């Protein structure tokens, strides 16, 4: 029953609508999608719980993208926190584009959303309750979703750049890479790109692991049971686009590739990511 408890797909509509608007910033796009953007944000606001004792909003009762965690005990998974922050801010932008006032309750949640939890080594946890993240292999297998908090998504105030770099380095050296999926490699590449580590970005895409295999027909092979895995293909295309075109505010040309003259990168028609 994993799928029933996943919440990380909920903001997808807002993210995709934002990409459509950025490709065609018009009233037509706003009229077509704004109602669904707002209704998605209404659910996201209602799903979050206000922790009165600590004066913060938390996410709980869900299985995170790293599916080895349990819904009954998981509090504040990092990727979901970051995605909530991004999507709620984006929904507010859509209100303004549509000539509507910002929702003050949503602004309060954006302001009081819990920061990502970390341990004494300044490594981000798989979730706030997973204090043994770096001791229990259950937490260091499957998707390293903590890296998606910055990479798939832009940096935000819930995250410290230095702690996220610490986390990337630990994952790179110690993760149970034999228990990963095809989109984990582009997710790692996007994280490394945003953190200014292009060598690791390229290295992640070229990592010699079974689930990072692409067959001659282009399919991302996982195993004999799962010979085509489209999330890997989508992740690869997204990662390369970010590595080439960058993101809002990025000043580095081709930020996902080493800047030492060894790469001649050519591309066209790509747009920066949020």
Q: Model-derived features: where do they sit?
A:
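Active-site core of glycosidic bond-cleaving carbohydrate-active enzymes
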Residues: 1-23, 31, 78-248
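Surface beta-strand/loop "capping" patches
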Residues: 254-274
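Acidic/histidine-rich catalytic neighborhood
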Residues: 39-97
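Bacterial peptidoglycan biogenesis and beta-lactam-recognition machinery
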Residues: 245-257
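A general structural signal for short secondary-structure junctions and capping/turn motifs
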Residues: 4, 49-50, 138-141, 270-273
